[in-house]
């Protein structure tokens, strides 16, 4: 017999915490510790919400919602980011477990004035979320790439220089093609604060402040290629195009990489990043939403107007 228990992060007992991390690591092939759990799910409220699927007093599944603060037309609203959804394979006989787990969470979210839940499901379950759980699709996140070294580091620093020379004509074309776009038109803005960065950024993430600019990135390897994932960039002067150029220049100077990747709707007059064609994307990244407040504007607002990038949801 299974049951569902909804708790806040600060209400999870030590035995539940140990049990959860074991199930989580098994589901995602990771090795987080109970200590990681506390910091991972901290939010501006001080906690997240967890819906545990329990069988024989063991946690065998979970849905977590992290409260996040946004500004809609400069008015503060609260959203919930759905993350770390899993059900262990031997407990998937009931196809409605996930639906029941999420529905059990909703009253707690509404009680905390959370007006929407948002998620980026993988391709294996995205249909379930939209057809069974009745989430609406806002759109798909773009892959934007900046090529640093087409020689993949084989000829040292010369590779970056030659790459810049070879791509110069394409950069000019890109600048012309993106003329007229404006990142500042985004009406749904993620609220960035010191508390947000404290719980969002991990040890592997780099937060750089220099010359009035701020950038956040993490370096990883994708298919044996060294990649810098640009999470966010901004300028104290409000010039995002200049901040993007400064971010790319900094990363190129500091890291041995071949590509810089920015995932999200860039919407900026710039020449450094190219939007990857849909047929070349490694996987689709649909953004889906559950409107908890019956706010029609949320459902009708295209993803281009959302400030939604790896800084919001990435689990790296």
Model-identified regions with their sequence ranges:
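Active-site/acyl-donor-binding loops of N-acyltransferases
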Residues: 40-43, 49, 66-67, 115-169, ...
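Mid-sequence acidic-hydrophobic segments that form the walls
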Residues: 66, 85-88, 104, 108-112, ...
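Short loop segments at secondary-structure junctions
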Residues: 56-58, 88-91, 291-293
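Conserved acetyl-CoA-binding loop-helix of GNAT-fold acetyltransferases
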Residues: 87, 92-109, 239-250
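Short, glycine/acidic-rich beta->alpha junctions
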Residues: 45, 97-101, 121
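Long, hydrophobic/aromatic-enriched structural stretches that serve as scaffold segments
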Residues: 62-70, 74-103
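Short, intrinsically disordered terminal tails adjacent to the first/last structured region
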Residues: 1-5, 310-312
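Amide-forming acyltransferase catalytic core, primarily the GNAT-like/NAT-type
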Residues: 4-6, 10, 15-62, 69, ...
């Amino acid at each position: 017999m299974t049951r569902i228990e909804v708790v806040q992060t600060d209400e999870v007992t030590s035995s539940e915490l140990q049990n959860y991390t074991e199930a989580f690591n098994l589901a995602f092939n990771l090795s987080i510790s109970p200590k990681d759990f506390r910091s991972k799910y901290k939010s501006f409220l001080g906690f997240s919400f967890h819906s545990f699927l329990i069988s024989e007093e063991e946690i065998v599944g979970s849905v977590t919602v992290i409260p996040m603060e946004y500004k809609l037309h400069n008015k503060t609203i609260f959203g919930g980011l759905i993350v770390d959804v899993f059900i262990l394979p031997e407990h998937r006989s009931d196809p409605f477990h996930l639906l029941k787990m999420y529905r059990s969470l909703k009253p707690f979210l509404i009680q905390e004035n959370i007006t929407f839940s948002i998620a980026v499901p993988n391709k294996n379950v995205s249909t379930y979320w939209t057809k069974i759980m009745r989430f609406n699709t806002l759109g798909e996140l773009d892959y934007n790439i900046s090529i640093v070294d087409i020689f993949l580091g084989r000829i040292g620093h010369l590779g970056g220089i030659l790459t810049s020379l070879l791509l110069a004509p394409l950069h000019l074309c890109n600048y012309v093609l993106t003329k007229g776009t404006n990142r500042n038109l985004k009406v749904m803005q993620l609220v960035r604060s010191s508390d947000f960065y404290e719980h969002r950024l991990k040890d592997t993430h780099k937060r750089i402040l220099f010359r009035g600019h701020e950038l956040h990135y993490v370096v990883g390897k994708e298919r044996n290629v060294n990649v810098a994932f640009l999470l966010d960039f901004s300028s104290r002067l409000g010039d995002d195009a200049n901040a993007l150029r400064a971010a790319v220049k900094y990363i190129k100077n500091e890291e041995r990489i071949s590509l810089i990747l920015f995932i999200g709707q860039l919407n900026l007059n710039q020449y450094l990043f190219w939007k990857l064609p849909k047929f070349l994307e490694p996987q689709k990244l649909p953004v889906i939403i559950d409107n908890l407040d019956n706010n029609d504007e949320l459902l009708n607002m295209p993803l281009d107007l959302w400030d939604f990038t790896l800084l919001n949801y990435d689990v790296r």
